[in-house]
Amino acid sequence: MIYLLGASHLMAILDACAAPGQPSAVPAIGQGQAPAFRECALRDGVLPDRLRVASIHVGHTAPFWGPALVEMLPQGPLGIAAGFQALLTGANTDATCLTLFVSLRGEEYFNLGLAGVDDPFDFVLPQRPDLALLPGHAVIPLDVIQAQLDQQLARTLLTLTAIAKLCPRLQVVRIPCPPPASSDDVAAWAATRDRPERAHRVATSVRLKLWLLYDGLSAQFTTGLAINSLPVPEQAVHRLGTLKADYMQDGIHGNARYGALVCAQMASVVSQAMKGAL
């Protein structure tokens, strides 16, 4: 059994792997609902094992969830909501499960980028000197950008810490959100849907640098928790590192074609885990 936990970025994966006639959009667990993974009927040959999915939101608050999924208590240890604890403990104790894939949030870099819509900013990312500073943009020190991203990421990283703590038996794998699409691609997407989309008004290179910093911080943190991260599929990105138009659902989400590439990565990870368990 494969377990998959996340929110909106799950949809690309489910669009790619769900059996015909199977709703690909797994409803998010309601705030008044007991937590549970739901089995998803799959297309033949997409994944090497059955799949159970739970769609959550890190901001859940309700009787089953508590004030938050995870919070840092004043005395230091993690406070894990009862519903979330039950969800994870159930996965960890399922003897048929070897791997839990996790795709949480992903909009943190996007939210920070929106601050540049009215007041354009830029910053130097040392590992990408090709992404030069843009004229007319206020230059913000890297440590200031990183501190703001750390704030955006805080709740997600606490949630990942709880997952690692409650699922010690499982191989936990982080699925990163896709990189941003180019400004031109997002603008074209917005125009075809007759809706405003502010994201394309932030320069492509700035959004890409924010994503690279965000993904690097996330991967570094999860590595310390013994959580591996899937790479972004090379076929889906331009040489610069932005998401190709053929693989985008909107400015920040991948589509079913992107999801199919992620499914192939998941299948490889699960197959290796199954061989290792023999």
Give the label of every model feature segment.
Residues L10-L14, A34, T156, W211-S218, ...:
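Short, highly selective alpha-helical patches that border small-molecule cofactor pockets
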Residues A41-I56, T61-P67, V172-V173, P231-I252:
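Short flexible/disordered coil segments
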Residues M1-Y3:
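Extreme N-terminal starter segment of soluble prokaryotic enzymes
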Residues A12-A18, P23-P126:
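Conserved SGNH/GDSL esterase-like catalytic core that processes O-acyl groups on lipids
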Residues A81, D150-L153, L157, A256-A267:
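Short, amphipathic alpha-helical "lid/cap" segments that border enzyme active or binding sites
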Residues K209, L213, A245-L278:
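Histidine-centered active-site loop/cap adjacent to the catalytic His
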Residues L88-K244:
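Alpha-helical cap/lid subdomain in secreted, periplasmic
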Residues A7:
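Active-site glycine-centered loops adjacent to acidic/histidine catalytic or metal-binding residues
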